[in-house]
Amino acid sequence: MNLDTFDEHPPYRLIPSQDLYRIQLARSRPGHRPIGQLRVAPAGARSGRFCQPDQRVAYFADSPETAGYEAFGRREQEWLSLDFLRRREVVWAQPGKELSLLDLTLHAAEWPVLQATRFAETQALSRAVKWHAEGRVVISGNRTIVLA
C-alpha cells in the first residue's frame, strides 16, 4: 500500500445535515462509558475493522440498511436470534460540524482489505492513515463512515 496516493484525492466532506446511522447495543456494557447517546467500545477493544488501541472508534453508515449489513452481514452471521436483535437499536445522528474525511472508496478495488473482515490488516491501515483526516470513509455497498 502506498499511502502517498491519498494525497492525490480530495477529502470527503461530511456536512452537518448528512444523516448517519449505526446499530449498537441498547444498553452499555459494564465499564463502557457512552458518549452522549452513542455506545462505543472503549479504546483498545479491537472489536471493529478500524479500531485502535488508543482511540474509541464509531462506525456509521449512510443508510439503515448499510448499518445493518456492517453490524450483522459483514460478520458473516448465518442466523440471528430475536433476543440478539432486541438487545440492539438503530441510532440516527448528524455531525455537529463539517468533517474532512479520508475517502478510501477509490482504493477498494486495488486494496481488497477495505472490503474484508481481515481485522489485523484494516487496523494496521487505520493506524497508518489516521493523521490524514478526522475520519475515514470506506466502501461497503454504500458508504460506511468511520470516526475516531
Tell me the role of every PLM-derived stretch.
Residues 1-45, 49-51, 75-148:
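Active-site and NAD+-binding cores of ADP-ribose-processing enzymes
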Residues 47-78:
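Extended catalytic/binding region for NAD+/ADP-ribose chemistry, centered on the ART fold
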